[in-house]
């Protein structure tokens, strides 16, 4: 049976030179304000983007597991759950607070900044920003470790299949799951390695971005541990839109990992391989130089869902004072 026609969010929009990643929590009794504001974000994007369409402003709005139950009545995404912290023999992938994720992108930072401010203004005291990262494109789409990032991203129909929910969860066809982690790099330790040794850590050549042959690629390299296959040998893909970030005055250099996928299980297996090891104890060597300081799993519904969301759960519906007129009663029956 074919899935209904829907409008996915711009998950597969091309990489841009500028991005802002905002993670926020929803305060007590903030559900109604956030619920209303989410339905107006499309209008904000159109209004700000109209000033200069060549800047290709976009945003992907995503909701965490706990927040979903506070914001929406009715069905919930079948695989949405809180991010599970991973504690390995050497490194930890922490789970950190986050109810809302805004992935804002454009050719220039000015419109990203304007949209971020407008979104937060629309939600006011109902939300608290717990993490804000301003990403930028580095030379040749490289991360701050000096390697090209996103080489193995799928494109075209393969990317759509890798990121878009279909018949397996018909209530949310066209939607997507997204993981985020903020990594901070130990540049002094990294730069103490020779280029050849750095290539063994990553599993690719540094200059020309070629994957090392299997006989030269260590089992604990980043590339080796991030190849996930089905039982029949078919490789499972995700779409990464990672961005470098940093503050030179603080000596902070990092990568913001953001991975979109049709099911969270693919990214979760990658993270288990990296932090717990595959086999157990064979952990990703890049973690000796890059420390995860945040971690979250969110759900990116369709534009249709955000523009016309289901009602608030009964427990989160604002209580009207006795004798007051429900404005909703003037709008006809609830959706």
Swiss-Prot record:
Its EC number is 1.11.1.7. Tetramer binds heme in a 1:1 ratio. Addition of hemin to purified protein yields a tetrameric protein. It comes from the Bacteria. It is found in: Encapsulin nanocompartment. One of its GO terms (cellular component) is cytosol. Signal peptide: none annotated. Keywords: Encapsulin nanocompartment, Heme, Iron, Metal-binding, Oxidoreductase, Peroxidase, Virulence. The C-terminus (residues 312-335) targets the protein to the encapsulin nanocompartment. Belongs to the DyP-type peroxidase family. Cargo of a type 1 encapsulin nanocompartment in situ; this cargo protects against oxidative stress at low pH. When expressed in the cytoplasm (absence of the encapsulin shell gene) it is almost as protective as the intact nanocompartment; its encapsulation has a modest yet significant effect on protection against oxidative stress at low pH. A heme-dependent peroxidase, it probably does not have deferrochelatase activity. Converts guaiacol and H2O2 to tetraguaiacol, also acts on 2,2'-azino-bis(3-ethylbenzothiazoline-6-sulfonic acid) (ABTS). This is Dye-decolorizing peroxidase.
